[in-house]
From Swiss-Prot:
The gene is queG. [4Fe-4S] cluster 2 binds at residues 195, 211, 238, 241. Binds 2 [4Fe-4S] clusters per monomer. Keywords: 4Fe-4S, Cytoplasm, Iron, Iron-sulfur, Metal-binding, Oxidoreductase, Queuosine biosynthesis, tRNA processing. [4Fe-4S] cluster 1 binds at residues 185, 188, 191, 245. Catalyzes the conversion of epoxyqueuosine (oQ) to queuosine (Q), which is a hypermodified base found in the wobble positions of tRNA(Asp), tRNA(Asn), tRNA(His) and tRNA(Tyr). Its cofactor is cob(II)alamin; [4Fe-4S] cluster. Residues 173-205 form the 4Fe-4S ferredoxin-type domain. This is Epoxyqueuosine reductase. It comes from Cellulophaga algicola (strain DSM 14237 / IC166 / ACAM 630). It is found in: Cytoplasm. Belongs to the QueG family. It catalyses: epoxyqueuosine(34) in tRNA + AH2 = queuosine(34) in tRNA + A + H2O. Pathway: tRNA modification; tRNA-queuosine biosynthesis.
Length: 306
């Protein structure tokens, strides 16, 4: 075993020990295949009012512009599939937001992984990324062999489905690189057929400006009336395309205590949601990603669903 293989194996083993679901590594270079796709997606205004998607176009496609002398992209996934879910007949929030804000949880684990690399390998330059910088997470995870990008544009695996977060360490260390896996979507169109707002405009292409997650989280203005009655009771985010995916039959509950829901969340009825106060909002969602939409945003969403 050469040094690169040894270092790669050490990093992967520690990632799993820290609770990550999987870890893969790819060479830090320009994403040639993704460049024209991203350009076309932006040109067709599929980012809606997410102006930040238009910024740092070059950096999104080349990690060497984000990290000096970048050699490797270490991609990691962290399971968030819950053991318990909201009851039927109430307003719904995406399962990723049940527990503590994933940014904070994952950053803590990435910091530990960086410290491990420094201790075991030596001084390694790099940066950690958790859905908060111009990095194409899913593209790097796919290049690293962690899964394939499904027709709903989420990363998929045969063994664990798609309910997991993706994070990266971009480092100036040469490592052994993994290979992409085969696409196993086949002729299935379950996600396309089930999308309440027809946001999956063709296989592998999601029009972000039509997605319920966009309307309930990203959009700051009023939700267009043309979508009234099409939200299937989703008040924050939407999991429909993942819920109907056959590969998610194999999703297993996470083992991260911080992702467990607030005790009051699962028992909220529609009436509770409609009468929610700012105090209750702060109590239940103080540490959740739901706080991103703020109390006023959640109220707007619920009013739209009534």
């Amino acid at each position: 075993m050469n040094t690169k293989e040894k270092h790669s194996d050490l990093i992967k083993a520690e990632a799993i020990r820290l609770g990550f679901l999987s870890c893969g590594i790819s060479k830090a270079n320009f994403l040639e295949e993704e460049a024209p796709r991203l350009e076309k997606w932006l040109k067709n205004n599929m980012n809606g009012e997410m102006q930040y998607m238009e910024n740092h176009f070059d950096k999104r496609l080349d990690p060497r512009l984000l990290v000096d002398d970048a050699k490797s992209v270490i991609s990691l996934t962290l399971n968030y599939y819950p053991e318990e879910q909201q009851a039927d007949g109430t307003y719904k929030i995406s399962k990723y937001a049940y527990g503590h804000d994933y940014h904070h949880v994952i950053k803590g684990k990435l910091k530990q992984l960086q410290e491990f690399i420094s201790e075991e390998i030596g001084e390694v330059g790099g940066r950690a990324f958790v859905d908060s910088a111009p990095v194409l997470d899913k593209a790097w995870a796919a290049k690293s062999g962690l899964g394939w990008i499904g027709k709903h544009s989420n990363l998929l695996t045969q063994k664990t489905g798609s309910f997991y977060f993706i994070a990266e360490l971009i480092v100036d260390l040469d490592l052994t690189y993994d290979h992409p896996v085969t696409d196993h979507c086949g002729t299935c169109t379950a996600c396309i057929d089930a999308c309440p707002t027809q946001a999956i405009v063709q296989p592998y292409v999601v029009d972000g400006s039509k997605c319920i997650s966009y309307f309930t989280i990203e959009l700051k203005n009023e939700i267009p009336q043309e979508f009234q009655g099409k939200f299937d009771d989703w008040a924050f985010g939407c999991d429909v395309c993942q819920d109907v995916c056959p590969w998610n039959r194999f999703s297993k509950p996470h083992s991260e205590p911080l992702f467990n829901p607030h005790p009051d969340l699962l028992s909220l009825t529609k009436k509770d949601w409609e009468e929610i106060t700012d105090d209750v909002f702060k109590k239940v969602f103080q540490k959740s990603a739901v706080k991103r939409t703020k109390y006023a945003g959640l109220k707007r969403n619920i009013d739209f669903l009534k």
